[in-house]
Amino acid sequence: MLRAVRLKFLFLFILTIIAIVFVLPSVTGELPGWWEKHVSRGLKLGLDLKGGMHLILQVDMESAIGNALNRDATDMKELAQKRGLAVKVGDVSKEALPVTLVNKDEQAAFQKFLKEEFPHLTAGEPQRQDGSLAFVLSLNPDEISQLRERTLSQSLEVLRNRIDQFGVTEPVLVRQGSDQIVVQLPGVQDPQRALDLIGQTAQLEFKLVDDQAQVNLPELIEQALKTGALKPGYAREQLNQALADKIPADDEIYIEKSVNRDTGRLESKPLLLKKKVLLTGAAIKNATVRIGDYNEPYVSVDFNSRGASEFGKITGENVKRRLAIILDGMVRSAPVIQERIGGGKAQITGSYTPAEAHDLAIVLRAGALPATVKIVQNITVGPTLGADSIKKGLTAGLLGTLLVIGFMIFYYRFSGLVADYAMILNVILLLGALSLLGATLTLPGIAGIILSIGMAVDSNVLIYERMREEFHAGKPLKAAIDGGYDKAFWTIIDSHVTTLITACALFLFGTGPIKGFAVTLSLGVILNLFTALFGTRVVYDWLLIKRWLKKLSFFEFFKQRNIDFVGWRHYAFVLSGALCLLGIVAFVQLSRGYGNLGVEFSGGALVEMTATKPFTVNAVRDILSREGWGHAEIQQIEGGKELMVKLKKSEASVGQISEHLADMLNKAMPDNQFKVIGKQEIGASISGDLRNKAIVAIIISMLGIIIYIAWRFEFIFGIGATIATFHDVLAVLGIFYLFHVEITLLVVTALLTLAGYSLTDTVVVFDRIRENLARKRGKLGEIINLSVNEVLSRTIITSSTVFLVVLALYFFGGVVLRDFALAMILGVLVGTYSSIFVASPIVYAWRKESKRVEVKREKVIELEAQKQRREEKKTTKPAPKKKSGKK
C-alpha cells in the first residue's frame, strides 16, 4: 500500500516538473537559446496581450466575377472580329454580360463560336431587336464555384507574399468560410501602413488617353452638378454614368492625381481614356524604389519578356500620344510617349513618401489581388494596452488565489490546505498543458484560468461535505474518507460534464479570443477532475498510512436546518417569473438590434485612448459635439486617464476615426495629450454573423445539457435543470438590459459559462433528492426539503469560492474583463438562488401535478366502468322463473 502511494506521489511530481519545464520560458527570459528551440517556447500570447492587429478580410466575389466577365468581353470583341461576326459587347452589370449579335442570321455561327471559345459561359434565351439578337451571358455554376475557390486561394497567396516582404514576425493568415481571410499581425509597429498594404488591390493597367475627343470634361462636370445629374462627392462610376451620352462609347473617365510643383498641393483632374486595356500588372517581373530629379521617390517597374515586348510595341505604335498608368482605378501619371521604349521598363510617379513608394513596390512585386477585399473586422491592440492587460490579469489571479486559499483554510482547517494544494497543482498543470499544446493565451483565457481557480476547489468541497456526513454517522475515519470520495464521484462528474458542454459550444461558435477561453476552461475542468479525485486522494492515503490524521475537523454553517423551501415556491415563482419576463424582453429587443450592444454585435468602431492628465467626460463630450460627433458614446475608465469612444455607424475606417479623434482632442486640450492605445472595427456582416453564432451557441449548449441531465437522472430533472439554467441566463441578461450595461462578446461568453456552471449546484441538489427518494419514505415535499437542507452549506460554499475569484476579477482585472466578471457575479448569486428555489420546486410541482392527473384519470376510469356496468344491467333482462304447482 505504501509503495503504491509513493509511486502515485512520484507520478504527480514528474507531471509537475514537466509542466514547469514547459511553462518556464514564460516566467523568465534568462534561459539559453537551445531551451526554447528544443524544449519549450512557453505560453504563446494572443494579440490582445502582446499587441498587434487581428483582421478579417471579406473577398468581394462579385468583383471577381465581374473581372472575369470583363476579360471575356475584351477577348470576345477581338475573337469575334477575327471570325467575321458583327457583335456589340456591352458593359458587365450584376454578373451578366450583354452581347448583341447584329445579324440574326448568324445565330448558329455565334452559338458555335461561344461553345468553342467560351465554353464556361451560359447564354440566356435571345431577344429579337430589329433584325438583331440580344444575348445575356453569364458564368455557369461550375465556373463560378471554381472561380470563387481560385480567387480566395490567390488572394491568400498574394497577401502572404506582401506581408512576408513587409517584415512582420510570425504572421497568421488562414481561410475562414468561403470568402473570408483572417490575418493576424503580432507586434506590428505601424497599423495604418499595414492596413494600406493589405487592403490595396494593386490592379495596374496601362491605357491610352483620348486627346482627340472634342470633349471639355470640366465644363460637362460643372453642368451635371448644376442640373443635379451629379451629386457633390461623386464616385468615378457615377461620373461615367452621368456623362455616358456625352463621351465616345469606347471611352471612360478617370481621375488623375498629381502634385503641383509650384504650390506643392495634391490636385485632381478628369481624364478621358480608352476603355481598352493595353497592358496589366500581370506582366511585371520586379518593382523597386528610385529617387527622381526632384528628390522624390518613384517606383521603377521591370516587365517580363512578354510584357517588355508588348510595352515596346505599345509605345512604338503610339508615339506623341499620352499613356496613362492606372493603379486601382486612379491615374498615377499620364506621360507623353516621345519614342519607342525598349528594355521593358516603366516609371510610376506621384506624391509618394519613401514608405508609400516602398509599399507600392511590395504590392506590385507580390501581384494584384484577383478581387477587391474589404476589412470587415479590425481589432488593433497597442503594446501598452497589452502589457497593462497582463499586469491586471496577474493581479486579479493572484488575489483570487489568495482569497480562495484563505477561505478554504478557515472553513476546512487542514483539509483546506489539501484542497489548496490541489488548486495550485491544477494551475501549474493547466499552464503546462497550454504550453505543451501550443495554445494561445488571450485575455479571455486569463479569465478562464482565474475562473478555474475558483472551480478547482468545488470538487473538494463536495468530497469534504460527504466526508463530514459519513464521519458524523459514526463511521471510522478511513471509511468516512472512502465514502466521501465514492459518494461525491458522480456528482462531480455530472457538474463537470455540463460545464464541458458549454465550453464545447463556445469553442465551436466563438471567435479567436473566445476559443482561447473555451480551451482554457475545458483544460481546467478536466485537470480539476484529476487533481481533486486523484491528487488529494493520494495525500489522504499517505496520511492514513502514516496515522498522522486522527479526525476530520471542519467548520459548519447552518447546523440542524429545517427550512421549508417547497413552501416558499409560490413567492419564488413570482420573482423568477418577473426576472424571466425581463430577460425575454431583453433577448427580443437585443435580437432586433436595440439596446446597448457592443460593436461586435452592432457593428461600428471602438477607440481606446490614454491621456497624460485626468479629464472630465463632459469636456470631451462638448468637444465631440462641437465637431459633429455628438452621437458618439463616451466612457471614462481607470482613474480618469483612459477614454473609450464608440461609434456604432460610420462610413470612415477606424484608422481614420482614431487619428481624427486624437487630433481633435489634442487641439482642443493642448495641455493634455491623448494617444490611441487600441481600436476595433466590426462590419455589419461580421456583427450579424457573431450575433447569430451567439444565439446558436446558447441553443446548442442548452440542448446538450437537457439531454445529459435527462439521461443521468430522469426527464423531469432535465426539465427542471433546463428551466433553472434558462432562468439564470435570462435573469442576468435582463438585469444588464435594464441597467444599460453593454452586451459584448465577453458578456455572452459569461452567460454561456454561467449556463454550464450554474448547473453545478443544481446537480448537487438533484443527486441528493434522487438518493433520498430511493432510501427514505415520506411525502415528496418533505424529502425535497430535507435534501436541499442537507446540501445547503455545500451549495453556498461552492458558490462562494467562485464568487471570490470573480469579485477579484471585477475590481482588479481591468475594464475589458469587468463586464464579464459582473455577469459571473450576478450569475453565481442567481444560480445559487435558482438551484434552491427554482429547480427543486419545479420537480415537486411537476410530480405533484402528474400524480394529481394520474389519480384523476384513475377516478375517471372507475366512474366510466361503473357507468358501463349500470348500462349492462339495464340492457340485460333476467331469465323467467318456472312456476311450481302442487299436485
Put a short name on every predicted segment.
Residues M1-M53, D130, V566-L590:
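Hydrophobic alpha-helical transmembrane signal-anchor segments
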Residues L2-R6, S300, R306-A324, A387-P444, ...:
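Interfacial segments of transmembrane alpha-helices in multi-pass membrane proteins
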Residues M61-V336, G688:
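Non-transmembrane, solvent-exposed regions of membrane trafficking/translocation machinery
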Residues T384-V404, M455, K475-T511, D564, ...:
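Pore- and gate-forming transmembrane helices of large, multi-pass membrane proteins
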